[in-house]
Amino acid sequence: MQIVDSQIHLWENARMSPQHRQIPTYSMDDALQEMAGAGVDAAVIHPPSTLGEAVNELAVNAVRQHPDKFCILGNFDLQSPDRLNIVKNWRQRPGMLGFRFTFNQPH
């Protein structure tokens, strides 16, 4: 049986919200090491929405290097003037399976 962690976050040089680990970076290599130690075969990356669009690219990079280990439910600014093109072309990005939004932000 394959074991998949359905929600992990990757970030780089960022301050995360209190619910997350309070470390400046949690990288693809950190995730792979912990996954191997826990017997997890693959993971779905959910880029933290509070960190903006650039964090999606961190996830895409992980998928490019380990397509057998990672896939992504990404996010974007719903107020973006380019939102229709973003949605239209979303799945062309490596590993993007769909979207995940949280609606608990003050905006």
Question: Could you tell me what each predicted segment is?
Answer:
Residues 53-107:
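Active-site gating/metal-coordination segments in enzymes
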Residues 1-54, 88:
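An N-terminally biased module of ancient metal coordination in phosphate/nucleic-acid-related enzymes
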